[in-house]
């Protein structure tokens, strides 16, 4: 039985912030590669003491992991908020992805914004962001290696 998509997701579709994107699955590998590269850079930057940039790079690793998941389902996003809504709808709702990963993405976004816009960052926050990014990438790789039919 096919699930009815929720009103927040439908609102994102209606506003054009989530769109059908049939070539999406062909972009998954590139997004995962970008996530991996950002994660590697975040780890190097953190090891060198660059807390602000490590936080920002870790968030973008999570963003690319999330985007890979969306592409795998044949959609693309035009807003970070709708990306989160789409992950909840397409992956968390049907119990394909644990909520902790979406909450981690949201926490990572807050850490990135604080670092980027307000120069507020810490070693603990940077380490948390890098750890979250590594876990999210591993989970996205697992999910995209399994056949997932477009919704």
Residue ranges of predicted features:
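Terminal alpha-helical segments
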Residues: 1-151
């Amino acid at each position: 039985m096919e699930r009815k998509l929720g009103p927040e997701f439908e609102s994102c579709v209606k506003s054009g912030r989530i769109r059908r994107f049939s070539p999406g699955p062909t972009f998954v590998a590139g997004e995962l590669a970008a996530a991996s590269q950002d994660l590697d850079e975040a780890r190097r930057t953190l090891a060198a003491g660059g807390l602000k940039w490590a936080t920002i790079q870790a968030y973008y690793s999570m963003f690319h992991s999330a985007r890979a998941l969306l592409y795998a389902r044949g959609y693309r996003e035009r807003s970070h908020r709708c990306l989160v809504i789409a992950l909840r709808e397409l992956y968390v709702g049907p119990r394909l992805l644990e909520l902790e990963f979406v909450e981690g993405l949201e926490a990572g976004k807050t850490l990135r914004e604080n670092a980027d816009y307000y120069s507020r960052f810490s070693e603990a926050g940077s380490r948390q962001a890098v750890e979250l990014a590594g876990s999210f990438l591993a989970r996205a790789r697992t999910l995209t290696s399994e056949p997932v039919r477009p919704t």
